[in-house]
Curated annotation (Swiss-Prot):
Oligomer and partners: Homotrimer.
Class of the enzyme per the UniProt entry, highest EC level: transferase
Residue pairs linked by disulfide bridges in the UniProt entry: none
Organism: Geobacillus kaustophilus (strain HTA426)
Reactions catalysed, as given in the entry: alpha-D-glucosamine 1-phosphate + acetyl-CoA = N-acetyl-alpha-D-glucosamine 1-phosphate + CoA + H(+); N-acetyl-alpha-D-glucosamine 1-phosphate + UTP + H(+) = UDP-N-acetyl-alpha-D-glucosamine + diphosphate
Binding site for Mg(2+): 102, 227
Chain residues that bind UDP-N-acetyl-alpha-D-glucosamine: 8-11, 22, 72, 77-78, 139, 154, 169, 227, 332, 350, 365, 376
Name of the protein in its database record: Bifunctional protein GlmU
Family to which the UniProt record says this protein belongs: In the N-terminal section; belongs to the N-acetylglucosamine-1-phosphate uridyltransferase family.
E.C. number(s) listed in UniProt: 2.7.7.23, 2.3.1.157
Entry's Gene Ontology molecular function annotations: glucosamine-1-phosphate N-acetyltransferase activity; magnesium ion binding; UDP-N-acetylglucosamine diphosphorylase activity
Region Pyrophosphorylase, residue ranges: 1-229
HAMAP family attached to this UniProt entry: GlmU
Length: 458
């Protein structure tokens, strides 16, 4: 049987108190609605329709061709939102799952079970329910003797007995597609809010003799909707724990999951250890047997095997195997660090390459540079790359040795195997295997201090 999906993503989200469109708020680095679409895409749907309203263009920019779009110009309720998908789905045979774009924790596994239960029950509609510790504010599920849905009672309309029911309506449904769009034509807005509600579709289907079933989600957490910053933080916490658990199941050691942030897209190899206070963002790939953290920030990096990054920041760069970075190093975007490199404490690397086995162990800035293999950069080495208008390249060839407190004024090349004496300011190219000394000769003034006014002779 063919499957379709409608993702409700038109709400403004006024309780978020934000300029950002609600469903675009990120959870673990990915917009809420993207989490939902990613899970829906695993269901093998023929069509996925995102119903958009406020911020429609931003949502389209985020989701692109992953789905089709229907515009809800006025937000007149959930049934009205689904009605906007009619031009895409009306008259098609199959089942349609309706899910909210602000439920980022829902999984494909739960939606798959919802669809399978719906089909096994030969239902016209199936409600995804959950057991809530505190069901206040939620619609309660009242079941009949057969276990099907007798009615959905909103909290404000529920009797004392009905309010004791902990099974709630999550707002996710599975419908027979043709039945859904037939019932939508009968929904009215004769209520205090003047809106069209999807729960009325359930009543219409029941009145027409259709079976309305219910499938209970494995956990309430999976079904929560994000309507304010408090719920956003809660969803972030749950998603972060879920991501950490999956990595740990895959063989990654995470010392303290509660203080570790890993994006949904990150890939981490087995036997890697993640220490507390570490943030791994974006599409980062980390190899096996690495040590990351504590207190490190990695974003959109490719990292090889057996690499250590401690108390450091690395963004948008490629880092090889058996590399040591930190503490307190900063690898800025577009850098490429080859195998067996050492980037030590208080070293900043910007848009530069380091060849195999090279070292910059302390207090250096290497920007817009090509550093060859087996190069040693002494403490305080600086590539002076900016002339106030343009950035210029520094090239340091294989085996070069740069002494402490050296300024390399770009554009400049230090040849293969060359030495640069400590304290030099290099403005011209240094030939291979040469020694460059670019500092004034030391002059000692004998008895100078004795001649200063007010100084006693010793």
């Amino acid at each position: 049987m063919k499957r379709y999906a409608v993702i409700l993503a038109a709400g403004q989200g006024t309780r978020m108190k934000s300029k950002r469109y609600k469903v675009l708020h990120p959870i673990c680095g990915k917009p809420m609605v993207q989490h939902v679409i990613d899970q829906v895409s695993k269901l093998g749907v023929e069509k996925a329709i995102a119903v958009v309203g406020f911020g429609a263009e931003q949502v389209k920019e985020q989701l692109g061709s992953q789905c089709e779009y229907a515009l809800q110009e006025e937000q007149l309720g959930t049934a009205h939102a689904v009605m906007q998908a009619a031009p895409h789905l009306r008259g098609l045979e199959g089942v349609t799952i309706v899910v909210c774009g602000d439920t980022p924790l829902i999984t494909a596994e739960t939606m798959e079970m919802l669809i399978e239960h719906h089909m096994a029950a030969k239902a016209k509609a199936t409600v995804l329910t959950a057991i809530a510790d505190d069901p206040s504010g939620y619609g309660r599920i009242v079941r009949n003797e057969a276990g099907h849905v007798e009615k959905i009672v909103e909290h404000k309309d529920a009797s004392e007995q009905e309010r004791n029911i902990r099974e709630i309506n999550t707002g996710t449904y599975c419908f027979d597609n043709e039945t859904l769009f037939q019932a939508l034509t009968k929904v009215t807005n004769q209520n205090a809010q003047g809106e069209y509600y999807l729960t009325d579709v359930i009543e219409i289907i029941k009145a027409d003799g259709g079976v309305v079933s219910a499938y209970q989600a494995p956990s309430f957490e999976e079904t929560i909707g994000v309507n304010d910053r408090i719920a956003l933080a809660e969803a972030e916490r749950i998603m972060r724990a879920r991501i950490c658990r999956q990595h740990m199941k895959n063989g990654v050691t995470i010392i303290d999951p509660a203080s570790t942030y890993i994006s949904a897209e990150a890939v981490i190899g087995r036997d890697t250890v993640i220490y507390p206070g570490t943030v791994i963002e974006g599409e980062t790939v980390i190899g096996e047997d690495c040590v990351i953290g504590p207190n490190s920030e990695i974003k959109n990096c490719y990292i090889g095997h057996r690499t250590s990054i401690r108390h450091s920041v690395a963004h948008d760069s490629e880092i090889g195997s058996d590399v040591t970075i930190g503490p307190f190093a900063h690898i800025r975007p577009l850098s490429k660090i080859d195998d067996e490199v050492r980037i030590g404490n208080f070293v900043e690397v910007k848009k530069s390459t380091f060849g195999k086995g090279s070292k910059a162990s302390h207090l250096s800035y290497i920007g817009d540079a090509e550093v060859g293999a087996d190069v040693n950069l002494g403490c305080g080495s600086i590539t002076v790359n900016y002339d106030g208008v343009n950035k210029h390249m520094t090239k340091i060839e294989d085996g070069a040795f740069i002494g402490c407190n050296v300024n390399l004024i770009a554009p400049v090349t230090v040849g293969q195997g060359a030495y640069v004496a400590a304290g030099s300011t290099i403005t011209d190219d240094v030939p291979g295997r040469a020694l460059a000394i670019a500092r004034a000769r030391q002059v000692n003034k004998e008895h100078y201090v004795d001649r200063l006014p007010g100084k006693k002779k010793s």
